[in-house]
Each structure stands twice: as C-alpha cells, then as structure tokens.
Amino acid sequence: MMRFTKFYAPSLKEAPKDASLPSHIFLTRAGFVEQIGSGLYNFLPLGKRVLDKIKNIVKEEMDKAGAQEVNLSFITPASLWQESGRYNVFGKELLRFKDRKENEFVLGPTHEEAMLSLVKNKITSYKQLPLHLYQIGLKFRDEARPRFGLLRCREFLMKDGYSFHANEEDLGREFELMYKTYSQILQRMGLDFRAVEADSGAIGGSGSKEFMVLAKNGEDDILICENCDYAANVEAAKRAKKTCQDERPEANYASKFHTPNIKTIDSLAQFFKINAFYTIKAVVKKAIYENESKLVVFFIRGSDDLQEVKAQNACSALELVDASEEELEKAGLVAGFIGFVGLKDIDFYIDFELENEKQMIMGANEKDYHLIGIDVVNLNKDRFKDLIEVKEGDCCVKCGAKLKQSKGIEVGHIFKLGQKYSKAMNANFLDENGKSQPFYMGCYGIGVSRLLAVATEASHDEKGCIWNKTLAPFVLEIIVSNLKDEKALEFANKLYEDLTNLGLEVLLDDRNERFGVKMNDFELMGFPYALVVGKGLEKNEIELIQREGLIKELIKTDELMEILKKKVL
C-alpha cells in the first residue's frame, strides 16, 4: 500500500539558490531530485517513477521500430576516440582519465565509437544489414557551467541508438522511421514539439533533425513557418533570398570614396543615404583549430548578422572567438574598413546571398576609405557559404511565407552519419559484389532525464508541477483532511484498495499534518487528481480536484467510482 507516511518524498519550502527555471525549482522542492554536486543529481522515488515511465515509452517505441537494446560500458577506451579522430575535436567536455596502469579512458558523452567497435568484424556481409542497436544509459559531459537543473547537467540519462546500413538509401529509410518513432514518443508524452532542421555539431554527418519541445524558457531559438512544415534551429535555419526595393548606389566599379571615421554599417548607410542592404559587413573572428589558430573574415550583407555556428562550420574550426584590436593590426586589417578586394594572406568567406550582387559598398582595406560599385562576381565558389542568422519575419525557404521565432528545448536529435566513423575506424562489410565497403551509419539520441525537466517546463503554474496521466508518478492522491475522523480514514483506505485493484496508481496521504500542508504538497508535486475525504462525507460527498486549473467538484459517494472511471482511469 502506497501511504505517504511510508513514502520518501522530502519536500522543501525554499528553492535552491541557483535555481532560476521552474523545472529546477519545483523538481527540487517537490522531492523529485536532489543535487549532490555541480551538475550531478540523485533521483528520489517520485523522480524515479517518472523516469521509469519515460524510459518505458522510449523502449516500447524503439522495440516496435525493430531496434535491439544493448548496454555498453559507461567508460570507453580513449584509443577508440583517437581512432575516430574525435578525441581532440570534442574539447574539454570530454572527460579523460587514466587508470593505475596509465591506460587512457573517457567517460562517454556519446557512443558512436563504442557501438561501431561492437559490430566491427562481426557484421561482415550485406546480408546481416540493416542493424539498429540502442541503449538507455548514463552519459557524462563535463559542462563548463552546469545550470538549469536537469536541462544542463554533467551526468544524464540518455537513449542513444546507432544503425548500420549497406547503402545511403537504406539509411534514409531508417532516418525517416526514427523521425516517426521520436514523434510518436513525444506525442505519447503529451508534449508540444517541432522537428527542426539542425546543425550536426561535433557528432558530424549530413542530415540532421532536432526535436524541440516548445517552452517559453527554452534555451534554443527556432524559426517556424506559419504556412508549411518548415522549422529549423536558428543555427541551421535558411530563408528565401532577401530583396530590397530601395535604390542601389550608382558608381563605377570599385570607386574609392573618402569616408572619414565612418566605421559602422549604420553610419555608412546614413553617409551614402542608402539602405544597409546594399552594404557589405566584415566580421573578423579568430578560428581555433587542433594545432593552430588564425584570423578569418566573414563578409555578409550589412543588414544581416553573422550566425556563429554557421561561420564555425564554414571554416571547419573547433571554436570561434573575437579577434582583438592588436591581432587585427598585426594582420594588417583596418577595423571598420575591411573588404575582400585586395585582401591577402587572410582566409575569408562570403555569404552566398551576396553572390552575383552588384553595385555594393564595402571597406577598401584603408583607413577612412570605402569602395562603392562592388560586384560580387568571379570569385571562387568555395568562398560562398551560408553565414547569416535568419530572423523572425524572414521568408520561408520552402514556401515563401513569413517565419515566426519561438523558444524550444532540445530533447532529441537524429543524424545521418554516413561513412564518417566507419571509414575512420576501418569498419567494413562485403557488399553484393563481394567488395569491401564502409558501413553507412545513423545516430539517434533522446534525453531521458532531460525529458523529466522539459515536461515540467512545458506544464506548470506558480504553485508547482502539473503532470499529465501518462507521466505522473501517481495519477491520484487521496487526502484525508482529518486523521482523527475514523469514518473518513476507513472510507479512504477502502477507496484506495478499490482504485488500486482497478490498476490506478494512487498515493494515500495519511500524514498527521494540517490540511493546508497536504494541499500545498499536492499542488507542488502536481499529481493530475486529488480526492479529499473530509467533512463532506457526512453528506455522502467527496471533493475531486483536477490539478490543472485547480478545478474542484463535489461528487456523491455512490457516483464516485463511475465518475472516476470516466475522468481518471
């Protein structure tokens, strides 16, 4: 019997000092989780019950899709990461350590290498493909600034799956199947989500989609088309090419014009009395690579902003940081007057929307001078990249309708890895012609422990969590308002047994606490329904409270079971 007096759920009156998001505040105060270190959390019985429900939904849908569950070691030999080339690329988030024999290991944030090692030299023929293996296990990422509770912690529970294929077409089919599977998982959890185009990050590969749950406290900006199904993370969003009806500047090609102290796009547009659309902005960054760093210049339209993830991908850097004035001077770059005409010994890239643009204004690489009448033509195609940040109000690349910006929290990510890892680790099979080929791989991750926090972010009020019936640790709480009322206690015990026998998850609050304390805990913990057994029993009435909206309803005892079967079961 699940009695509150025997159930370990230590609630707190005050939120942790560093808690700013509702999920962090309520999950900690309600006794779902407990922080034991920076980015490290224990799951208490309430949290574990929700976590198990999330895991079961994920497992059921993955099994239904034909994937097979395995359980890999939390620790991976560093040699596998060195073999794939990710050992240095991943950065400081990858926790590296040595055992007493000086052997190097990592705590796995993902398991591409370990899973590939599992099938290498065992899956040897196309006849054994496709194969999809997954696990639900702990991961570790040494975040520089763990924050937001379970949303950005260092140790987390994740479902990561990896598929192996004989060709790209078969990988594409599995990618679409996982798209449907992840959508079904999130639909079953009752979450409002969007699958969006995304950047592949350190994992790499080609096709990539993120699953974002919409939430006002989301850490990611996403662009959603108001007309079609296009949606994308701002890091990967595309738009229909912009146009401008304002008059272009007119001048001979690359005429040099004296522009004293005109260092910003706004002052440049004002000086020439033109729209900033017809200017070219230079953004200088220091690109960090494995064994070196160097300055890179990105040229974009003056009316746009640089999207740094796109810029980082364009130059294949591990990281981009701002360049100092001293570094600009040393490279011979004049801040506020940089252009690509005559630019020497510096890598540069141009946003692809500028290709073939004419009569533009750009820096002359000389203090207090700009070039007007610039035509962006006859340049190496490799210099043109997608560099700009798409914003709300821009037009959809698919249908041309307006894009709307929303906040989202990433809960899942699916990738087409292609042959990146299999080539690096020499993992091959024999195709239909007996020829050795690298596997085509897919990678599919979903944040299991993160979903607990995301569900809270998506559904709460000022009093606490609001769980739906699918994820709630208990669907119904029976609250005895006065333990000295023996008739009420007897009725509550009998009701508990009857509802439990019907398969309902019920918690009986039999604590010797004031009624107000019990109600506060119900509102904080967020079970979907509560039944209050109290004075109304004298009139054969029980109060049913729906947590969402705190809607109260008096029900006659002889109608109670029928109403509960309709509303709660």
Swiss-Prot record:
Pfam families from the UniProt entry: HGTP_anticodon (PF03129), tRNA-synt_2b (PF00587), tRNA_edit (PF04073)
Signal peptide region: none
InterPro entries: aa-tRNA-synt_IIb, aa-tRNA-synth_II, aa-tRNA-synth_II/BPL/LPL, Anticodon-bd, Anticodon-bd_dom_sf, Pro-tRNA-ligase_IIa, Pro-tRNA-synth_IIa_bac-type, Pro-tRNA-Synthase_IIa_type1
Top-tier EC class: ligase
Keyword Protein biosynthesis: yes
Gene3D superfamilies: Anticodon-binding domain (3.40.50.800), Bira Bifunctional Protein, Domain 2 (3.30.930.10)
CDD domains the UniProt entry points to: ProRS-INS, ProRS_anticodon_short, ProRS_core_prok
Reaction catalyzed: tRNA(Pro) + L-proline + ATP = L-prolyl-tRNA(Pro) + AMP + diphosphate
Main location per the UniProt record: cytoplasm
GO cellular component entries: cytosol
Gene Ontology terms: biological process: prolyl-tRNA aminoacylation
Source superkingdom: Bacteria
EC numbers: 6.1.1.15
Keywords: Aminoacyl-tRNA synthetase, ATP-binding, Cytoplasm, Ligase, Nucleotide-binding, Protein biosynthesis
SUPFAM superfamilies: Class II aaRS ABD-related, Class II aaRS and biotin synthetases, YbaK/ProRS associated domain
Cellular compartments annotated: Cytoplasm
GO molecular function: aminoacyl-tRNA deacylase activity; ATP binding; proline-tRNA ligase activity
HAMAP family membership: Pro_tRNA_synth_type1
PANTHER family in UniProt: MITOCHONDRIAL RIBOSOME PROTEIN L39/PROLYL-TRNA LIGASE FAMILY MEMBER, PROLINE--TRNA LIGASE
Domain remark in the UniProt entry: Consists of three domains: the N-terminal catalytic domain, the editing domain and the C-terminal anticodon-binding domain.
Family that this chain belongs to: Belongs to the class-II aminoacyl-tRNA synthetase family. ProS type 1 subfamily.
Role according to the record: Catalyzes the attachment of proline to tRNA(Pro) in a two-step reaction: proline is first activated by ATP to form Pro-AMP and then transferred to the acceptor end of tRNA(Pro). As ProRS can inadvertently accommodate and process non-cognate amino acids such as alanine and cysteine, to avoid such errors it has two additional distinct editing activities against alanine. One activity is designated as 'pretransfer' editing and involves the tRNA(Pro)-independent hydrolysis of activated Ala-AMP.
Complexes and interactors: Homodimer.
Record-given protein name: Proline--tRNA ligase
Organism of origin: Campylobacter jejuni (strain RM1221)
Gene: proS
